[in-house]
């Protein structure tokens, strides 16, 4: 509990002297006090209070803090400070996501070492962050570019490698020609690099992957645990990205090839409608089939493949583009019908979907139909979409002469080959032999059973999710702890040899060239094999920086421990994170990777939980004039200018009051100057209090006490529902009520005024800590108000005063009833209609209209019954 000043209240000494709210003076006064007191440290082993872990997504050190940072850290701090007031020990740390391309590119542009550039930016941001005053535990700071951190990235890599979850393979990868490095699928947005916005191409490289697809089912199914605790939009985005589908793997024999080709399909019921096969031109199967083709076919294929490699994935999947392809002059065999079908290579099939080959059913798939029409391939309808898809299965009779099925009469089917529109709706199978008349679900089951019985297929699942490509051809990242030995192959670096330090950048050409600059550091690259002692070379790629952030929440538990990544006992105490705050831009990348790594650590016994973040809050963006802020648009608002002009607390309060936290804030529409005026008004309330700190409040003004205690009762629910703007609005009402009591009511000496001022101060601490701390001192207490328990409301003060509702019948008052001021229109009308006085007055007359003005008036109009 905070201690009282021996000198009594500052306000009493000040008397009626005019005072001025000086935010700069207040900030200068309290920041060094907090630095000395460390009120937010969480290193006391004897602290047995319940715990909360509140974490903001850590920033990237590219320049100073901006308006987006200001919003995120203001909102996260509301939550951290709230839980401290609720009696919790709160872990609220901060660090820097310090590796990565932006720092490396900025350093190259300026001719600097990425280390110096990064650490200078961290120092600048740290100073700005301290000024902004989030309630961070500054003894738990980390930077991911420190060897003391990335040593444990390498440890994590080795743990995945031991379990076969980290592996290296050659494949077609996403390639950013500007940054000259590979990208994970999640880092490609609409065919462009999510960092530099350049078009992404494909390139065949040998790269390192994490086997996240092994966890696809769990990553999808465990989203159910997060329903209601994470934004629905984020959960939907992850579900769609993981993209589980069910169907069958169907084996198609290839004429002239010993091994069949597996084709994944969600619609095995349409097998009778397959008229050709399409393979991805950049797949190994296409290359193999083209290799055995005639020279002119092989040449056409190679020319086509070269063109495809210059096409973005988005363009390849577009339904608007003209379909292109090459006939490979090879044929496959339909496993159900025995029909020979031609094999084409076409760019609308991707090598990493299913098995890189599809069975084309042009009558019932639009892209297949577009391709079939472009190359005059047959179109066979096998689903009658005019037949009901559900209900009783129709009895299928056969023509006694031809043996052909006689289906129930229905509207004539239009030919997709003529209309250009595929029949994608539900219906009944036709032209499908023994499966005619079956609905989609029954046909899928029956066809799959038939394939399985003959060894030509089996039920299967497929995922949109691909393994996480984690190697990068750049300098500023975590070195991969593997050496390559001609005799032994891949050899992991022993844990005792970690960290594998980055070599100095001096002397290395960091300009992007498509290969890692580390390859030129010969003294660093060439080492002895840890297995046989022979010559070996270090792996020269560095890790994707999303590896760094996938587990950083655990490193905060003991960031200075050089013996382990984190202490499992501390993880039991603090983790998982109770409240995570950050932008929706990380809905897939960071959050999905963190969920994956957490499950890996769970499986290996390092943690006892499977989800890293219990509750997630995504804040909106800070805009200017309806657009994202940028120098090029000329609408950039500098945070430092706003802090200088209005003060830290006014900016923080504005961020919380502007609207629901998940909504965007347009800085042109808000008023930090208005926030500053409110803070001055609240601050003067504390200054004007003249009663002593130890007064008994019960004898204070009852009306003000009711306002105060209603605020005390309602605020916890509002904060926990993230309705920070509503809390601020209610706080303004409390300040106004207190001011009114001081100026025209019971006066500044009234005990209820002190109570209201103290509650105002505690609540204001959530949003404006400098002002709140100064108010707390003016009220006669020692710092810090942050550690003061939230007051419990008096239930007797929460009982609403009744109001008198007048009930009129035909303009005459017939009854008066005492009701709640919050009574609804329907409730008040029902109460009036049931009044005995009203019933007597109405008698047998007909009620024509009832006008209700809740909570004070009901007017009933009647007329004689004819």
UniProtKB/Swiss-Prot annotation:
Family: Belongs to the class-I aminoacyl-tRNA synthetase family.
GO molecular function: aminoacyl-tRNA deacylase activity; ATP binding; leucine-tRNA ligase activity
Motif mapping: 'HIGH' region: 59-69
NCBIfam families registered for this protein in UniProt: leuS_bact (TIGR00396)
Listed EC numbers: 6.1.1.4
Pfam families in the record: Anticodon_1 (PF08264), tRNA-synt_1 (PF00133), tRNA-synt_1_2 (PF13603)
Keywords of this entry: Aminoacyl-tRNA synthetase, ATP-binding, Cytoplasm, Ligase, Nucleotide-binding, Protein biosynthesis
GO BP term, pick one: leucyl-tRNA aminoacylation
Location of the protein in the cell: Cytoplasm
Reactions that this protein is recorded to catalyse: tRNA(Leu) + L-leucine + ATP = L-leucyl-tRNA(Leu) + AMP + diphosphate
PROSITE patterns attached to this UniProt entry: AA_TRNA_LIGASE_I
Chain positions of motif 'KMSKS' region: 628-632
Annotated protein name in UniProt: Leucine--tRNA ligase
Binding, ATP: 631
Top enzyme class: ligase
SUPFAM superfamilies named in the record: Anticodon-binding domain of a subclass of class I aminoacyl-tRNA synthetases, Nucleotidylyl transferase, ValRS/IleRS/LeuRS editing domain
Low complexity composition bias: residue spans: 404-418
Region annotation (Disordered) ranges: 393-421
């Amino acid at each position: 509990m905070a201690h009282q000043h021996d000198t009594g209240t500052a306000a009493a000494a000040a008397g009626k002297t005019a005072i001025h709210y000086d935010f700069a003076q207040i900030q200068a006064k309290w920041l060094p006090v907090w630095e000395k007191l460390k009120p937010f440290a969480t290193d006391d082993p004897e602290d047995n209070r319940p715990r909360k872990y509140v974490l903001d997504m850590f920033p990237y050190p590219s320049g100073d803090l901006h308006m987006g940072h200001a919003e995120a850290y203001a909102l996260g701090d509301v939550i951290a400070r709230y839980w401290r007031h609720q009696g919790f020990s709160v872990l609220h740390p901060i660090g820097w996501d310090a590796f990565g391309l932006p720092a490396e590119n900025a350093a190259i542009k300026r001719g600097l070492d990425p280390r110096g550039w990064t650490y200078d930016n961290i120092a600048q941001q740290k100073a700005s962050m301290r000024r902004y005053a989030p309630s961070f535990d500054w003894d738990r700071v980390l930077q991911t570019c420190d060897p003391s951190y990335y040593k444990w990235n390498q440890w994590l890599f080795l743990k995945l490698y031991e379990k076969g979850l980290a592996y290296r393979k050659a494949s077609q990868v996403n390639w950013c020609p500007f940054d000259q490095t590979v990208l994970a699928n999640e880092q490609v947005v609409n065919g462009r690099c999510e960092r530099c916005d350049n078009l992404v191409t494909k390139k065949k490289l040998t790269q390192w992957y994490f086997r996240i697809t092994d966890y696809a089912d769990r990553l999808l199914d465990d989203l159910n645990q997060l329903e209601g605790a994470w934004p629905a939009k984020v959960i939907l985005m992850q579900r769609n990205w993981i993209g589980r589908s069910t169907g069958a793997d169907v084996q198609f024999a290839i004429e002239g090839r010993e091994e069949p080709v597996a084709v994944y399909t969600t619609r095995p019921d349409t097998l009778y409608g397959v008229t050709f096969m399409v393979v991805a031109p950049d797949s190994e199967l296409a290359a193999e089939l083209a290799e055995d083709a005639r020279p002119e076919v092989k040449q056409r294929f190679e020319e086509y493949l070269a063109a495809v490699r210059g096409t973005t994935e988005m363009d390849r999947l577009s339904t608007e583009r003209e379909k292109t392809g090459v006939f490979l002059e090879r044929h496959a065999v339909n496993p159900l019908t025995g029909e020979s079908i031609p094999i084409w290579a076409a760019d609308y099939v991707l090598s990493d979907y299913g098995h890189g080959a599809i069975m084309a059913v042009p009558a019932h798939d639009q892209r297949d139909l577009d391709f079939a029409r472009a190359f005059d391939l047959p179109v066979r309808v096998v689903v009658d979409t005019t037949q009901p898809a559900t209900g009783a299965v129709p009895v299928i009779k056969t023509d006694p002469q031809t043996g052909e099925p006689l289906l129930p009469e229905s509207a004539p089917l239009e030919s997709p080959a003529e209309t250009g529109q595929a029949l994608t709706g539900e219906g009944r199978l036709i032209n499908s032999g023994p499966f005619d008349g079956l609905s989609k679900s029954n046909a899928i089951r029956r066809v799959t059973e038939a394939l399985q019985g003959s060894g030509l297929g089996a039920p299967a699942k497929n995922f949109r999710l691909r393994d996480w490509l984690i190697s990068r051809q750049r300098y500023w990242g975590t070195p991969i702890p593997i050496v390559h030995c001609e005799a032994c192959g891949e050899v992991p670096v022993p844990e005792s040899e970690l960290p594998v330090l980055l070599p100095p950048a001096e002397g290395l050409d960091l300009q992007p060239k498509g290969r890692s600059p580390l390859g030129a550091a010969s003294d660093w690259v060439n080492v002895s094999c840890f297995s046989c002692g022979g010559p070996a070379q270090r792996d020269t790629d560095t890790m994707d920086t999303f590896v760094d952030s996938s587990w950083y929440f655990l490193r905060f538990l003991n960031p200075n421990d050089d013996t382990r990544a984190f202490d499992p006992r501390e993880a039991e105490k603090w983790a998982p994170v109770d409240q995570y705050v950050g932008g929706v831009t990380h809905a897939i990348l960071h959050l999905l990777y963190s969920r994956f790594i957490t499950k890996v650590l769970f499986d290996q016994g390092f943690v006892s939980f499977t989800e890293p973040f219990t509750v997630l809050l995504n804040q909106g963006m800070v805009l200017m004039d309806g657009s994202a802020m940028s120098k090029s648009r000329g609408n950039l608002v500098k945070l430092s200018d706003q802090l200088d002009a209005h003060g830290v607390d006014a900016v923080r309060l504005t961020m919380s009051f502007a609207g629901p936290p998940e909504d965007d804030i347009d800085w042109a529409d808000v008023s930090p100057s208005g926030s500053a005026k409110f803070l001055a008004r609240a601050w003067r309330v504390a200054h004007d209090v003249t009663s002593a700190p130890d007064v008994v409040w019960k004898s204070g003004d009852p009306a003000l006490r009711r306002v105060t205690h209603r605020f005390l009762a309602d605020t916890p629910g509002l904060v926990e529902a993230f309705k920070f703007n509503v809390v601020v609005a209610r706080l303004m009402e409390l300040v106004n009520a207190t001011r009114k009591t001081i100026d025209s009511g019971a006066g500044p000496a009234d005990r209820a005024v002190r109570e209201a001022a103290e509650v105002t101060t505690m609540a204001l601490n959530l949003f404006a800590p400098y002002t709140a701390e100064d108010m707390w001192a003016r009220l006669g207490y020692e710092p810090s108000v942050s550690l003061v328990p939230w007051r419990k409301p008096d239930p007797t003060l929460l009982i609403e005063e009744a109001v008198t509702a007048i009930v009129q019948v035909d303009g005459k008052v017939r009854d008066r009833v005492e009701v709640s001021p919050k009574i609804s229109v329907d409730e008040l009308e029902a109460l009036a209609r049931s009044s005995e006085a009203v019933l007597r007055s109405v008698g047998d007359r007909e009620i024509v209209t009832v006008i209700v003005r809740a909570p004070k008036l009901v007017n009933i109009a009647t007329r004689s019954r004819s």
